[in-house]
Amino acid sequence: MADTAATFVFADIAGFTALTEAHGDEQAAALVDGFANEVESELPPGATRVKSIGDAVMLRVPDPGEAILLGLRMTRDVLREHLAFAVRVGLHHGPAVERGGDYFGATVNVAARVSSIAAGGEVLTTGETAALVPDLGGVLFESRGRHTLRNVAEPLEIFAALRTADRGADALPVDPVCRMSVDPDRAVGRLEYEGTVYFFCSLPCAAHFARHPDRFAAA
């Protein structure tokens, strides 16, 4: 069945593979469950969670402005109450075909590819989608240049959606052990080594670093 246009959003936990390797399957599975539940609680009216794919969620949001605001809430608020990890988001607006509750087509493919190039804490969208909401209050768009995305015929200009108040903010630091992006305000531990401060997602990561600082600082 042909679907009316909507914004498709893909969001996942930055560095999730490294987290699984460092902390094990049980903690990783618990993190995924918490992530999906937090995302569900943030959905605006009319939006739906289409499915979960590993640590990622696929969402359908009727309005592109609401989708961008949702993405910004996820990168700032989802997981912040209990966890220190960063979320990355990619989205694109357009038509798709619905089959058994799932959605297919070029729009969905572009949204997924855009999410794959986002950094932790970043909300990326296409120029076409950003142009639909030029006056979204408190939000600005910064070009990230043109990108060639897998299985997308033409290069697309990609934009980062930013809260006006956050413009110029530094990127999130990375846990040197598990390579997870870490929110400094929620980091479980921090250590200084040779003049550099390192932030950690967990006490085990901090302990690993303390035992072998040369190995992890070099990485």
Describe the role of every protein-language-model region.
Residues 1, 128-218:
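Intrinsically disordered, glycine/charged-rich C-terminal tails and inter-domain linkers
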Residues 1-69, 77:
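Catalytic NTP-binding/metal-coordinating core of nucleotidyl cyclase/transferase enzymes
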Residues 3, 58-168:
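Catalytic beta-strand-to-alpha-helix segment of the class III nucleotidyl cyclase homology domain
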Residues 11, 62, 125, 200-201:
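A conserved hydrophobic position in a structured secondary element of the catalytic/binding core
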Residues 38, 77, 114-117, 208, ...:
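Conserved short hydrophobic interaction patches
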Residues 42-46, 81-83, 183:
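Short secondary-structure junctions
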Residues 49-50, 115, 189-190:
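Short secondary-structure boundary/capping segments
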Residues 53, 99, 193-194:
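Structural motif
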